[in-house]
Amino acid sequence: MAKGKDVRITVILECTSCVRNGVNKVSTGISRYITQKNRHNTPNRLELRKFCPYCYKHTIHGEIKK
């Protein structure tokens, strides 16, 4: 039996360098990824290194609120 319900939630990861630069003149948007995380294993905000097609490099993508 499961201990609790809604343990695994859907989160949105957003590129931190696009947001910090205020969407610089070269980039045309902000990269976002949708993934899931287990709330019991990772209670704090999730940060993953993913590819940003607007920055043309791998950057840190942080979890944002919905």
From Swiss-Prot:
Which PROSITE patterns does this UniProt record tie to the protein? RIBOSOMAL_L33
Q: Species lineage, top-down? A: Eukaryota, Viridiplantae, Streptophyta, Embryophyta, Tracheophyta
Quote the protein name from its UniProt record: Large ribosomal subunit protein bL33c
UniProt cross-references to HAMAP family, sorted A to Z = Ribosomal_bL33
* Gene Ontology terms, MF aspect: structural constituent of ribosome
Question: Which SUPFAM superfamilies does the protein's record reference?
Answer: Zn-binding ribosomal proteins (SSF57829)
NCBIfam families according to UniProt: PRK00504.1, PRK00595.1, rpmG_bact
Keywords, alphabetical: Chloroplast, Plastid, Ribonucleoprotein, Ribosomal protein
The GO annotation for biological process reads:
translation
Tell me the Pfam families matching this sequence: Ribosomal_L33
| Lineage top rank: taxon | Eukaryota
User: What gene is this protein translated from?
Assistant: rpl33
Q: Which Gene3D superfamilies has this protein been placed in?
A: Ribosomal protein L33
Which family does this protein fall into? Belongs to the bacterial ribosomal protein bL33 family.
Q: What species was this sequence derived from?
A: Panax ginseng
Q: Where does this protein reside within or beyond the cell?
A: Plastid, Chloroplast
One term under GO cellular component: ribonucleoprotein complex
